[in-house]
Swiss-Prot record:
It comes from Archaeoglobus fulgidus (strain ATCC 49558 / DSM 4304 / JCM 9628 / NBRC 100126 / VC-16). Transmembrane segments: none annotated. One of its GO terms (molecular function) is GMP synthase activity. InterPro entries: Class_I_gatase-like, GATASE, GMP_synth_GATase, GMP_synthase_A. Pathway: Purine metabolism; GMP biosynthesis; GMP from XMP (L-Gln route): step 1/1. Residues 2-183 form the Glutamine amidotransferase type-1 domain. Its EC number is 6.3.5.2. The gene is guaAA. Catalyzes the synthesis of GMP from XMP. Pfam families: GATase (PF00117). The active site is at C74, H161, E163. This is GMP synthase [glutamine-hydrolyzing] subunit A.
Length: 183
């Protein structure tokens, strides 16, 4: 099982890598400028967070050209929405804070996770409109699209950072993503 983490210059990308490694996955933190051809043998990708949609390198190509499960974290979630025709805009709250997220749709990504969890998130930017072919999985009082997934492909996005200590059930979420990658 090989799941790579795409480094988008986010402060928590190394924690995603460590979480996957601790869960027994062969993983590597790779630059977002890595050619698509060098990622053809992975079983899944995590598109990490970062400061700017303008600095996501080849991530759009990864989303369009690779046929593997992917999860976008924060900026990765926003990029996924944008690439597939959704809208991203300023959130009502900048900076990081604890947010209560409600899971509104059953999905294997949230298997064994309570319907309401407290997570660590920034809402400087957020997904404002779902892309066509995606469905909303979670919401909060400050953001209507905290998590989403493609209706047919194993493409997921979450606004929060499951890899940080402040987020409840983050390890479980990554464990569930690993199971999705095994299928």
């Amino acid at each position: 099982m090989k799941i790579y983490v795409i480094y988008n210059y986010g402060q928590y990308n190394h924690l995603i890598h460590r979480t996957l490694r601790d869960l027994g996955v062969e993983t590597k933190l790779v630059e977002n400028t890595t050619p698509v051809e060098q990622l053809k043998d992975v079983d899944g990708l995590v598109i990490g967070g970062g400061p700017s949609l303008d600095r996501t390198g080849n991530c759009e190509l990864y989303l369009k050209e690779l046929d593997v499960p992917m999860i976008g974290i924060c900026l990765g979630h926003q990029l996924m929405a944008k690439v597939f025709g959704g809208e991203v805009g300023k959130g009502s709250m900048g900076g990081y804070s604890e947010v209560k997220v409600r899971i509104v749709e059953d999905d294997e990504l949230f298997e064994g996770i309570p319907r309401e969890i407290t997570v660590w998130a920034s809402h400087m930017d957020e997904v404002k409109k779902l892309p066509e072919g995606f469905k909303r999985l979670a919401e909060s009082d400050i953001c209507k699209i905290e998590a989403m997934r493609h209706e047919k492909k194993p493409l997921y996005g979450v606004q929060w950072h499951p890899e940080v200590y402040h987020s409840q059930f983050g390890v479980e979420l990554y464990r569930n993503f690993i199971e999705i990658c095994k299928k």
